[in-house]
Curated annotation (Swiss-Prot):
Pathway(s) where this gene product acts: Amine and polyamine metabolism; carnitine metabolism
UniProt keyword Ligase, yes or no: yes
Family: Belongs to the ATP-dependent AMP-binding enzyme family.
Classification lineage: Bacteria, Pseudomonadati, Pseudomonadota, Gammaproteobacteria, Enterobacterales
The keyword Ligase is annotated on this UniProt entry: yes
Keywords: Ligase
Protein name, entry field: Crotonobetaine/carnitine--CoA ligase
Protein's job: Catalyzes the transfer of CoA to carnitine, generating the initial carnitinyl-CoA needed for the CaiB reaction cycle. Also has activity toward crotonobetaine and gamma-butyrobetaine.
Enzyme superclass (EC): ligase
Catalytic activity: 4-(trimethylamino)butanoate + ATP + CoA = 4-(trimethylamino)butanoyl-CoA + AMP + diphosphate; crotonobetaine + ATP + CoA = crotonobetainyl-CoA + AMP + diphosphate; (R)-carnitine + ATP + CoA = (R)-carnitinyl-CoA + AMP + diphosphate
GO molecular function: carnitine-CoA ligase activity; crotonobetaine-CoA ligase activity; medium-chain fatty acid-CoA ligase activity
Length: 517
């Protein structure tokens, strides 16, 4: 079944502008509360001007351009402006530092970068090192340096025509993006995403949440992340909805923003839910228009129940990763939701639980979650310039090895156990970090928790818990270990605990465990 029908991203925006015209497409709110708004017609014009800007700077079909930006309308302009001329976006996590960013530039052979003034000093050093192909920087901001090889994005973009001047032949098989994975355990890999992938993501995710053109989809997820792009922006635009993009997350402001924009759909990660729950309760907590809150792993049953009861919302669970493009397993329209299940497989996909010999397992047995899709269409095409890594993850028949552990029940509902790399081998027993984290997070003094395995000469690995306490709380080792012993099997009780003020996280809220070992 081909639901894309040969429509590339250039055709998508031309069609949307013609169909929805003056209807609001994008609302952006900065940290300072400044709001910028664009209709479908005006947003398409901004995209065309940006495409013409890239052409003016020498970018042609197949060229790669990096974006190092926080959430802003210019990210949207660049993303689709590059796609319209067949060029390739390489988004860079805005939290990365110089060495990490330079590594991505080098590995994707990027010569042009779009970034903001705050990141310019880092890239000036990278250019001076001559360690990457980077030779031109286009800066977004007001007060910009007059350095060689630097241009002013807004000034140049404003001079461009609103009509596209370069229209090379495009195919839905063309690469639209190289998105580097978060690399929480190793160097990131460049996930190759096609025009078809993005168009399919729009239709699929809109189906998953039954999105309509009168919906308002609000997100604070970073635009350089697959979630914002394929679970929020693409479905919102594909359905003709209004997409509300917030610059950054504020626990104090978020629920007011939900009400302010009359959002009907939003998305939350566990960190957001936990920080929202520590805000003072108000009589207006349940006064909103939300019908769905997209949710991504992991949350304890107590946390989930407390959140849904206080705010009067329901969570729509979705499971996926950069390589799957969308949430390929999740709560489906019309399905009964079966917490803590991550849902059932979505349309066009197959899913199996497999053992270490790559054989399918029956219901109830834990193994690796494997997904079957079509490379370059419903799942990623390949890892950029890494054929061996591609071959390890992706079978010729389209089966993707996720590296995650889970099981399914007799009714086809799937359950996530843990990232396979997060399973701790302790004296012959396999211990799930997520299971322990969910148990320990129920302690009333604990705000945040992560469990890791550390080397142990006798038992292979020992278990260590890193803890963030609620403000003003204290917790002794004796109290902590007593709680664990009363709530889990003896072999699962951590050997060590460490109290910290915070935990290292990447852009999507995932804890960077390699920084804790």
């Amino acid at each position: 079944m081909d639901i894309v029908g040969g429509q590339n991203l250039r055709q998508m925006w031309d069609d949307l502008a013609g169909m929805y015209g003056d209807k609001t497409a994008l609302i952006f709110e900065s940290c300072e509360g400044i709001v910028r708004q664009f209709s479908y017609a005006s947003l398409n014009e901004e995209i065309n001007r940006t495409a013409n800007l890239f052409y003016y700077l020498g970018i042609r079909k197949g060229d790669r351009v990096a974006l190092h930006l926080d959430n802003c309308p210019e990210f949207i302009f660049c993303w689709f402006g590059l796609a319209k001329i067949g060029a390739i976006m390489v988004p860079i996590n805005a939290r990365l530092l110089g060495e990490e960013s330079a590594w991505i530039l080098q590995n994707s052979q990027v010569s042009l970068l779009v970034t903001s003034a705050q990141f310019y000093p880092m890239y000036r050093e990278i250019r001076q090192d001559n360690s990457t192909p980077l030779n031109h920087i286009c800066l977004i901001g007001e007060q910009l340096p007059a350095d060689d090889g630097v241009s002013h994005f807004s000034q140049l973009q404003a001079r461009q025509s609103a009509t596209l001047c370069y229209t090379p032949a495009l195919s839905t098989d063309d690469t639209a993006e190289i998105l580097f994975t978060s690399g929480t355990t190793s160097r990131p890999k460049g996930v190759v995403i096609t025009h078809y992938n993005l168009r399919f993501a729009g239709y699929y995710s809109a189906w998953q949440i039954a999105l309509r053109d009168d919906d308002v989809y609000m997100t604070v997820m970073p635009a350089f992340h697959i979630d914002c792009q394929c679970t929020a922006a693409m479905p919102a635009f594909s359905a003709g909805s209004t997409f509300v993009l917030l610059e950054k997350y504020s626990a104090r402001a978020f629920w007011d923003q939900v009400r302010k924009y009359q959002a009907t759909v939003t998305e939350c990660i566990p960190m957001m839910i936990r920080t929202l729950m520590v805000q003072p309760a108000t009589p207006t907590d349940r006064q909103h228009h939300l019908r769905e809150v997209m949710f991504y792993l992991n949350l304890s049953a107590q946390e989930k129940d407390a959140f849904t009861e206080r705010f009067g919302v329901r969570l729509l669970t979705s499971y996926g990763m950069t390589e799957t493009i969308v949430g390929i397993i999740g709560d489906r329209p019309g399905d009964k939701r079966r917490w803590p299940s991550i849902g059932r497989v979505g349309f066009s996909y197959e899913a199996e639980i497999r053992d270490d010999q790559n054989r399918p397992l029956p219901a109830g047995e834990i193994g690796e979650i494997c997904i079957k899709g079509i490379p370059g269409k419903t799942i990623f095409k390949e890892y950029y310039m890494q054929p061996e890594a591609t071959a390890r993850a992706l079978e010729p028949e389209g089966w993707l090895h996720t590296g995650d552990s889970g099981y399914q029940d007799e009714d086809g509902y799937f359950y996530f156990v843990d990232r396979r790399c997060n399973m701790i081998k302790r004296g012959g027993e396999n211990v799930s970090c997520v299971e322990l984290e969910n148990i320990i997070s129920a302690h009333p003094k604990i705000q945040d928790i992560v469990v890791v395995g550390i080397k142990d000469a006798i038992r292979d690995e020992a278990i260590k818990a890193f803890i963030v306490l609620n403000e003003g709380e204290t917790l002794s080792e004796a109290e902590f270990f007593s709680f664990c012993e009363n709530n889990m099997a003896k072999f699962k009780v951590p050997s060590f605990m460490e109290i910290r003020t915070d935990l290292p996280r990447n852009c999507s809220g995932k804890i960077i465990k390699k920084n804790l070992k």
